[in-house]
């Protein structure tokens, strides 16, 4: 019974850590995508300004 409790505790901790890591990874991924989108948009706007002048 004690062994089962320890396994359950370890599984719960691992599950929580996995959830936190997934949230961090998702946040990191969204941040990188936003940064790339901003750079692309900025480049396109700069190119459009050069074409107009």
UniProtKB/Swiss-Prot annotation:
Keywords assigned by UniProt, alphabetized: Cell membrane, Membrane, Transmembrane, Transmembrane helix
One GO CC term, this protein: plasma membrane
UniProt name for this protein: Uncharacterized protein YwmE
Highest taxon above the source species: Bacteria
Predominant localisation class: membrane
Annotated source species: Bacillus subtilis (strain 168)
Transmembrane segments: 3-22, 26-45
Its membrane topology: Multi-pass membrane protein
Entry's localization field: Cell membrane
